[in-house]
Amino acid sequence: VMHDGKFGYEHAFNSIDILNSNNKNLFIISNSSKRSKSSIDRLPKLGFKKNSFINTVTSGEMIWQLLKKKFLSDKNKKNCFHIYDEEKEDGLDFRDGLNFNFVEKVEEADLILACTPFVKLQPIDYIPLLEAAYNKEITMYCANPDFETVEINTNNNIFCMGAIGEIYKKMGGNVIIKGKPCLLYTSDAADEQDR
């Protein structure tokens, strides 16, 4: 773990300095639902130097790339129900470059893009939404496989989209998840080194 959400840990700074001084190639592999560029741009705010790392690969980026490749055509544009935290300023940025009609009701959707939980909803509150999706056989693309994280200000455990994806999977729903410990992460990072 490199940071607490606000600033980097001392052990992370020290380790990175030692590895950089020994000419080691460093990659960040993260289960963040954010795109990689967004995570890279955030590094200085956390106290890290961007040039300390060769690349950053996030689960969010892997899902975005998958959706971009899978739904290229303007023909029969798909309806997407997007689950995201409306209070986060970059919540809608994930949509940039994706070729979907974004809809407000899951019943109108062809797929679900699950990035970050809606504000003030608990896992149980998703059951009606997931039941409606299951009845329509809608696939969920989950951009964060983590089940929970620690809230910075309160130190409370809060759930992540991976928990909602797991509920949907146990209901019988189809869930596509990318992230650690998926082997594609390491190959994506290695591909970047070869470029």
Say what each PLM segment does.
Residues V1-G5:
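Asp-based phosphoryl-transfer active-site loop
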Residues H11-N23, P128-A133:
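Catalytic-core regions built around general acid/base machinery
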Residues N14, N20-N99:
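Active-site phosphate-binding/coordination module
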Residues L98-L111:
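Short acidic low-complexity segments
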Residues L111-C115, Y141:
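Structural motif
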Residues P117-D125:
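Active-site glycine- and acidic-residue-rich loops that bind
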Residues A143-L184:
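Glycine/Thr-rich beta-alpha phosphate-binding loop at enzyme active sites
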Residues Y185-R195:
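Single conserved hydrophobic/aromatic residue that forms the stacking wall/gate
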